[in-house]
């Protein structure tokens, strides 16, 4: 059906054209839509929509003529339905994967309840708070003066990465790259560079297979002054004097890929210092992006008033542009507080409520490791979503999500909206126009439920199901053509890079600007073994995977464990009890526990993240007394509790821990037992099973050079002492 016939059948289109508009925008159909392979175009029905004047609202809503609001809303709903019919024919919805809920996807029932229980806000109150963020918000929108200080208006310099990334990319290039991703005809070309003697980076950029494309090392200035910051941010953050150098060594590494809108996967060193420094930088970047987006809209509002016939594409489907995912309310408090302090805005609505619900001065026991004290300090509640709306004079916390510029959430909190069991409450339209995404402290999130992060990516940058006051005449074409993923910048910060982190940045990000990752060279003296301080036999067993199949790796590991390690335990020439088997993955734990129950006569017990407190106490006591020969111990329980397991004489690591601190903490169980005179270090052993796929964890435990030898040499058994 032609577009003209659609208009004839729908009276809502009649007499509804923007006055003075000469040209209509086009929506491209994919070439596969016609038998002849030609490209069809349809007049953008949304071009004919007018909108009521709303200059005071700084959002993705444009100004227009005044008319009856109820009539306008009815027309817009019908027009949007027509537009969705066209768009969904271009971009069919993939079938939803059936998600199987098992124990590994549940939150640990008992974890931290004795030390970090948050009784201030119950789960019901938290859920209502989140749902309120989706309700219609009829607050006064005349709170943002559409005028802006002329000194702080951007010059739209083509050298500004904000302009070159979002506004200067040829449409033909975007279409070709988008089609290449769909047909899996994309490859990444990479270059390596040095950051220091012990750190390097890898920059990779997507190119269409068959095209001659030279990928050069990204421009490095290591200076914040190389980028176009808003004047308000310069004044607020002391960046007016270019003779000063405000950046730390860490920030100099990150400033270029960050402000060039490249995807980032960054592995940092220090919990306290490094986290504070990279948050300073990304808070500045986020604010700069929000301010530039707002000012561009305001400037184009003025241009349209001067010349209504011009076309200005500067908006997405919905207002939110930044999504920040953090593990706990404590981290959310620190991030939001950082954003407020750097914003240059004094008025913050509902700041007291936010501090009451997110700030907590409680500290974990000092007997726990320092890393534990850092991760679990303050408010450890992991169920929240909060919106931040920026006007010229104020920041509004707890704003309606569709009226927010920034959304700060936990994986569990936003999961409740995206995958709500009540289908009527499911929504993801507010994620349709995200241009910057930050995942902070991924290493902590991985112990909550990493699948929630992948769920978020499934819902990003989709075409909305409903209209949300968007001016279709100003929506960028790459939003309409469902190409926003090519423009979205994703930044992931973690203490330890893991396979899951690599999977996110490599498999779920399509940024046309490429991705930037750092890699740290770990000397043997800085490895876990080098810092253990114990002279104990540490034996590493490698098993090979036929065909290097990642999918079959768990089966090969289990086969090696049951055919080599279990017989060794049964016929042990060392201690007959006190054997601790450390298992990082819960599914592996279930498999091993079932095997030992059904196939062996070994007297064993187990403690895991789902054990009741009674089971935890009973099995730990029996193991310490030697009445249990073997104890199965999960990594997730260790992360949340950091128990001191007594009675340990030997350790078997079913897989190298991703966190190298855990390796030393578990090995020291033997050392503490030896100090009490209950074991002999000359008889005790530590065994670790690994494959080539464990390279990331292995190099943190034995060092980078040793890990390469262990992974690729002919020998399959290596011993350290």
Swiss-Prot record:
Cited Pfam families: Utp25_C (PF06862), UTP25_NTPase-like (PF22916)
GO biological process, one term: maturation of SSU-rRNA from tricistronic rRNA transcript (SSU-rRNA, 5.8S rRNA, LSU-rRNA)
Localization per Swiss-Prot or TrEMBL: Nucleus, Nucleolus
GO MF annotations in UniProt: rRNA binding; U3 snoRNA binding
Residues modified as Phosphoserine: 53, 63, 196
Gene3D superfamilies: P-loop containing nucleotide triphosphate hydrolases (3.40.50.300)
Region of interest (Disordered), residue spans: 1-168
Assigned GO CC terms: nucleolus; small-subunit processome
Keyword annotations: Nucleus, Phosphoprotein, Ribonucleoprotein, Ribosome biogenesis, rRNA processing
Domain of life the protein comes from: Eukaryota
Keyword rRNA processing assigned: yes
Record's function text: DEAD-box RNA helicase-like protein required for pre-18S rRNA processing, specifically at sites A0, A1, and A2.
Listed Basic residues bias regions: 15-31
Keyword Metal-binding among UniProt keywords: no
Ranges of biased composition (kind: Acidic residues): 55-72, 140-161
Biased composition (Basic and acidic residues): 1-14, 88-105
PANTHER family in alphabetical order: ORF PROTEIN-RELATED, U3 SMALL NUCLEOLAR RNA-ASSOCIATED PROTEIN 25 HOMOLOG
Name the UniProt record assigns to this protein: U3 small nucleolar RNA-associated protein 25
Gene: UTP25
Self-association state and partner proteins as the record states: Interacts with snoRNA U3. Interacts with MPP10, RRp9, UTP8 and UTP18. Component of the ribosomal small subunit (SSU) processome composed of at least 40 protein subunits and snoRNA U3.
UniProt family annotation: Belongs to the UTP25 family.
């Amino acid at each position: 059906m032609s577009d003209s016939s659609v208009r004839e059948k729908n009276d809502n289109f009649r007499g509804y054209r923007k006055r003075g508009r000469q040209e209509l925008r086009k929506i491209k159909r994919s070439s596969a839509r016609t038998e002849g392979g030609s490209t069809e175009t349809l007049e953008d029905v949304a071009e004919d929509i007018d909108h009521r004047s709303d200059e005071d609202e700084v959002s993705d809503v444009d100004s227009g003529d005044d008319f009856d609001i109820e009539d306008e809303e009815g027309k817009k709903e019908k027009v949007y339905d027509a537009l969705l019919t066209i768009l969904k024919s271009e971009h069919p919805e993939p079938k939803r994967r059936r998600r199987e809920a098992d124990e590994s996807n549940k939150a640990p029932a008992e974890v931290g309840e004795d030390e970090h229980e948050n009784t201030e806000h119950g789960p019901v109150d938290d859920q209502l708070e989140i749902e309120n963020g989706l309700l219609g918000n009829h607050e006064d929108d005349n709170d943002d003066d559409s005028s802006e200080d002329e000194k702080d208006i951007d010059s739209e310099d083509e050298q500004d990465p904000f302009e070159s990334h979002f506004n200067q990319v040829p449409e033909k290039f975007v279409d070709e790259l988008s089609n290449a991703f769909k047909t899996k005809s994309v490859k990444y070309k990479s270059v390596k560079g040095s950051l220091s003697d012990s750190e390097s980076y890898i920059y990779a950029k997507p190119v269409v297979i068959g095209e001659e494309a030279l990928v050069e090392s990204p421009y490095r200035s290591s200076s914040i002054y190389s980028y176009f910051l808003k004047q308000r941010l310069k004044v607020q953050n002391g960046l007016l004097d270019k003779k000063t150098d405000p950046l730390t060594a860490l920030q100099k590494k990150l400033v270029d890929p960050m402000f060039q809108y490249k995807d980032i996967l960054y592995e940092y060193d220090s919990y306290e210092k490094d986290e504070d420094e990279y948050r300073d930088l990304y808070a500045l970047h986020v604010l700069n992006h929000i301010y530039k987006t707002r000012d561009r809209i305001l400037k184009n509002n003025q241009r349209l008033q001067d010349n209504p016939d011009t076309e200005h594409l500067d908006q997405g489907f919905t207002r939110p542009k930044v999504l920040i995912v953090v593990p706990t309310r404590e981290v959310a408090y620190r991030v939001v507080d950082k954003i407020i302090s750097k914003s240059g805005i004094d008025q913050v609505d509902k700041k007291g409520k936010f501090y009451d619900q997110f700030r907590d001065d409680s500290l974990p026991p000092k007997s726990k490791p320092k890393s534990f004290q850092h991760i679990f300090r303050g408010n450890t509640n992991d169920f929240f979503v909060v919106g931040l709306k920026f006007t010229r004079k104020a920041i509004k916390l707890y704003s309606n999500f569709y009226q927010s510029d920034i959304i700060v959430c936990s994986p569990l909190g936003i999961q409740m909206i995206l995958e709500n069991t009540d289908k009527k409450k499911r929504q993801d339209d507010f994620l349709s126009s995200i241009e910057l995404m930050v995942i902070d402290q991924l290493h902590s999130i991985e112990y909550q439920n990493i699948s929630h992060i992948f769920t978020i990516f499934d819902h990003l940058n989709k075409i909305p199901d409903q209209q949300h006051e968007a001016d279709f005449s100003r929506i960028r074409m790459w939003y309409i053509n469902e190409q926003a993923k090519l423009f979205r910048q994703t930044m992931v910060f973690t203490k330890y890079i893991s396979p899951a982190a690599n999977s996110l940045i490599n498999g779920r990000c399509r940024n046309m600007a490429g991705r930037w990752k750092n890699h740290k060279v770990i000397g043997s003296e800085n490895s876990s073994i080098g810092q253990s301080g114990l002279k104990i036999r540490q034996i590493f067993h490698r098993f090979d995977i036929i065909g290097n199949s990642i999918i079959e790796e768990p089966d090969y590991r289990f086969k090696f464990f049951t055919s080599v390690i279990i017989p060794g335990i049964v016929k042990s020439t060392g201690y007959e009890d006190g054997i601790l088997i450390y298992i990082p993955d819960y599914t592996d734990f279930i498999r091993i526990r079932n095997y030992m129950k059904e196939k062996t006569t070994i007297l064993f017990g187990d403690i895991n993240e789902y054990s009741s407190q009674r089971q935890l106490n009973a099995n730990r006591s029996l193991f310490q007394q030697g009445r249990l020969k073997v104890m199965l111990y999960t990594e997730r329980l260790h992360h949340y509790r950091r128990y001191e397991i007594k009675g340990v004489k030997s350790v078997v690591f079913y897989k190298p821990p991703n966190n190298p601190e855990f390796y030393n903490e578990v090995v020291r169980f033997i050392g503490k037992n030896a100090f009490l005179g209950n074991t002999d270090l000359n008889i005790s052993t530590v065994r670790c099973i690994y494959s080539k796929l464990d390279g990331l964890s292995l190099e943190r435990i034995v060092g980078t050079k040793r890990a390469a030898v262990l992974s690729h040499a002919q020998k399959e058994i290596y011993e350290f002492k």
